Amino acid sequence: MRTYYIFSSGRLRRMDNTLALELETERRVVPVEDIDHIYCFSELDLNTRLLDFLAQKQICLHFFNYYGHYSGSFIPRESQLSGFLLVRQVEHYLDQAKRLELARTFVEGALHNIRRNLEKREYDDICSKLDEIREGIGKTASIEELMSLEAHARKAYYDTWEEITGWEFGSRSKRPPANALNALISFGNAMMYTVVLKEIYRTALNPTISYLHEPSERRYSLALDVAEIFKPVFVDRLIFRLINLNMLKETHFDTNVNFVYLTEGGRKVFVKEFEETLEKTILHRKLKRNIRYKSLVRLDLYKLIKHLLGEEKYSPMKVWW
């Protein structure tokens, strides 16, 4: 399945049994049969007829504003429903011991993958610090304590980024991102979130019931939980590569008063390489066959379902390459 990116302002509408993107000077026909995501990075006019058509075709539509900040997603009605699984999801949230167990596994997976990013870069002192923090995961008594532990680990991790990239970083700033590296992280994390959200939609999991992040209105918090595991592998490694290979430069960023954002050219570079990353293949050690990177997300969700159903303990994806 393909992902379609829209960077030009215009109107997206249904035309017979396909899509038409009407720009100021041309009309582009967009076949829908092999598309599962559409990303919009510009002003776009659409109507309910289009949304109904996208829902029929099970196509997700993701919106980013002028500055490349994630605004939200149109997600079709759930195609795979399981009342029993929903009950089990809720049970694991309401039972604090079960919730904490799952939340710990998300953090453990994330910190393992963070450490792997540093192992070959001779950051032995930081790796040792991460090991100490990971040893404390099983001792945490609350979600708040666990998230505080994760925050300390990420700070130690981010302290290496200026040396790895050669770019100014300082500290992590999200709303708004204070410099180019922070803008890249925020943009990449938003892209990862949408990938996980789409994969959740392909299962019977409810994306609003989560364990590490607190469920709340107006967000699919389970996608945030699972994305923690994959951000170090799909996003952080890509950022290092784009900068170290000089594919992204500081000219790919603009500053608006008190924050920095990717230009359209910068976003195009990132999404192109991000798509290629998702399509890469790796020999899966357990399945003994090559699978695409983005398939790792779906496999992780299936493992989570088995855990919720009491069939098998959940073990998050831990990068081995």
UniProtKB/Swiss-Prot annotation:
GO biological process: defense response to virus; maintenance of CRISPR repeat elements
EC number: 3.1.-.-
Domain of life: Bacteria
Manganese keyword on record: yes
Keyword field: Antiviral defense, DNA-binding, Endonuclease, Hydrolase, Magnesium, Manganese, Metal-binding, Nuclease
Binding site for Mn(2+): 150, 213, 228
GO MF entries: DNA binding; DNA endonuclease activity; metal ion binding
InterPro entries: CRISPR-assoc_Cas1 (IPR002729), CRISPR-assoc_Cas1_C (IPR042206), CRISPR-assoc_Cas1_HMARI/TNEAP (IPR019858), CRISPR-assoc_Cas1_N (IPR042211)
Cofactors named for this entry: Mg(2+); Mn(2+)
Similarity remark: Belongs to the CRISPR-associated endonuclease Cas1 family.
Function recorded in the entry: CRISPR (clustered regularly interspaced short palindromic repeat), is an adaptive immune system that provides protection against mobile genetic elements (viruses, transposable elements and conjugative plasmids). CRISPR clusters contain spacers, sequences complementary to antecedent mobile elements, and target invading nucleic acids. CRISPR clusters are transcribed and processed into CRISPR RNA (crRNA). Acts as a dsDNA endonuclease. Involved in the integration of spacer DNA into the CRISPR cassette.
Assembly and interaction partners: Homodimer, forms a heterotetramer with a Cas2 homodimer.
PANTHER family referenced in this protein's UniProt entry, alphabetically: CRISPR-ASSOCIATED ENDONUCLEASE CAS1 (PTHR43219:SF2)
Stored HAMAP family: Cas1 (MF_01470)
Name of the featured protein: CRISPR-associated endonuclease Cas1 2
Organism of this sequence: Moorella thermoacetica (strain ATCC 39073 / JCM 9320)
Designated gene of the protein: cas1-2
